[in-house]
């Protein structure tokens, strides 16, 4: 599986599918939800990935987010009765808390009306409680009647659920917008227990969620189930991801190479997609029986952009999952091939687990020093040659090579889309000469599409 962040590999590798018995799948991620593009259903994200994506703080925001994700499971699962019961429980708890407040009746009335304008159910809404909370001469008409209606009396009834346990997140399909409603319910439930400041504490997380809901580059993550959006199962998605098709009771390999073209998206999207796909692949191979019988290689192009030694400034820190794969992946048949121009910026944990190295020309002193620390058995004479290595030449060393060796890489045919600009030929353009370049063409008009996980 190739994480192609520069859109280079399809031109070179797609022809391998022509009569060679090597299936090649080329999928394009451009951030849109257009037909034929890569899609990643948002419910495939784990709870910890949601926490990172929304940058939820551990002490206040994470508990609210976990409760909201659990509620989102009810939004999706068709269990309308259970969801309505929890909503009634939360509203009844909130209204009861307001009744016990020391403020005056007019203030309590206004707070209840405002609350039920935002959140209400068929059983608890402004019309159903109006008879209890109307103000007569500065006093609420029938507060005890409202208490009996909400909490029940000697004859039973009421909406409070004793010993209620909030549902846990189960990665079931749900509308992306439903998480926003679930966050509001979770905050409301916390407010009902006296935490008046929780909404302010969670305001940044809510803002980040609304940003994800609106940003065009995250359209690939948002699935519209009500609008007829395709609802892939995780098994179907993973089988396509690993190039498998089912033939009766057996899995058959269809594609040997899966190229995920991420040239059209920014680093934060690359980091999110790479992290989630790597984690899903790792989990699948850990659960495979027998283990270690289906090796998978992840080729991480420009790895310093999302497997960095320092925490990411974006939401998802992909280094975590790749560090675990680097340490444990060999037990399950998952391996990393890390390609980077800046080895000094890569995760030290990932680099420490690499057993073979192919090093092209490197001139940066920090990178040279880093290589020296990684490979103490290489002589200074060999390292001094690295800044002056010709194009297509590299130094190879590691467990697969008896002695560090410099070699020339054979010409690729066909070449990847990574040619250097011919500055000498293209710098000067006579007036009126055609530029021979298309400007402003959207990625969806340029790229081809192969199998798509949508």
Predicted features by range, described:
Residues 1-31, 40, 396, 428-429, ...:
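Glycine-rich phosphate-binding loop of nucleotide-binding enzymes
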Residues 2, 7-17, 39-324:
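P-loop NTPase motor domains
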Residues 2, 28, 208, 258-261, ...:
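Structured core elements
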Residues 6-10, 33, 264-266, 304-305, ...:
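Conserved nucleotide-binding/hydrolysis micro-motifs of P-loop NTPases
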Residues 21-24, 257, 334:
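Short, conserved active-site loop motifs that form the nucleotide-linked donor/cofactor pocket
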Residues 26-32, 40, 44, 357-366:
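Conserved AAA+ ATPase "SRH/arginine-finger" region at the nucleotide-binding site
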Residues 56, 317-410:
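Conserved ATP-driven motor cores of ASCE-family P-loop NTPases powering translocation/secretion/packaging/pilus
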Residues 121-124, 139, 143, 152, ...:
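Conserved P-loop NTPase motor module
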């Amino acid at each position: 599986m190739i994480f192609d962040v520069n859109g280079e590999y399809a031109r070179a590798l797609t022809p391998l599918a022509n009569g060679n018995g090597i299936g090649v799948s080329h999928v394009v991620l451009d951030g849109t939800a257009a037909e034929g593009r890569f899609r990643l259903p948002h419910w495939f994200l784990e709870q910890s990935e949601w926490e990172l994506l929304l940058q939820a703080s551990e002490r206040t925001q994470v508990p609210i987010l976990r409760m909201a994700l659990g509620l989102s499971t009810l939004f999706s699962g068709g269990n309308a009765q259970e969801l309505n019961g929890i909503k009634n429980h939360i509203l009844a708890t909130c209204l009861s808390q307001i009744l016990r407040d020391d403020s005056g009746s007019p203030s309590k009335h206004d707070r209840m009306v405002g609350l039920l304008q935002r959140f209400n159910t068929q059983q608890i809404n402004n019309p159903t409680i109006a008879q209890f909370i109307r103000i007569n001469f500065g006093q609420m008409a029938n507060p005890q009647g409202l208490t009996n209606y909400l909490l029940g009396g000697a004859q039973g009834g009421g909406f409070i659920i004793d010993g209620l346990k909030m549902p846990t997140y189960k990665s079931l399909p749900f509308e992306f917008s439903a998480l926003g409603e679930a966050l509001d319910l979770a905050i409301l439930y916390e407010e009902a227990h006296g935490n008046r400041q929780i909404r302010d504490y969670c305001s940044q997380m809510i803002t980040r969620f609304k940003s994800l809901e609106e940003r065009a580059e995250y359209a690939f993550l948002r699935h519209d189930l009500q609008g007829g959006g395709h609802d892939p199962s995780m098994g179907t998605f993973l089988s396509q991801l690993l190039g498998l098709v089912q033939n009766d009771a057996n899995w058959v390999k269809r594609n040997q190479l899966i190229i995920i073209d991420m040239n059209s998206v920014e680093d934060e999207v690359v980091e999110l997609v790479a992290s989630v796909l790597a984690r899903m692949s790792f989990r699948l191979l850990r659960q495979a029986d027998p283990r270690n019988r289906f090796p998978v290689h992840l080729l991480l192009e420009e790895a310093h952009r999302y497997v960095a030694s320092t925490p990411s400034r974006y939401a998802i820190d992909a280094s975590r999952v790749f560090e675990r794969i680097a340490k444990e992946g060999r037990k399950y048949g998952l391996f990393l091939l890390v390609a980077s121009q800046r080895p000094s910026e890569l995760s030290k944990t990932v680099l420490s687990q690499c057993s073979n190295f192919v090093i092209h020309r490197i001139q940066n002193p920090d990178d040279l020093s880093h290589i020296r620390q990684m490979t103490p058995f290489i002589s200074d004479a060999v390292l001094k040659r690295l800044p002056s290595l010709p194009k297509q030449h590299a130094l190879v060393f590691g467990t697969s090579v008896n002695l560090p060796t410099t070699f020339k890489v054979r010409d690729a045919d066909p070449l990847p889309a990574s040619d250097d600009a011919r500055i000498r030929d293209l710098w000067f353009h006579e007036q009126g000469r055609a530029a021979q370049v298309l400007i402003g063409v959207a990625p969806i008009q340029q790229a081809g599409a192969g199998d798509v996980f949508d």
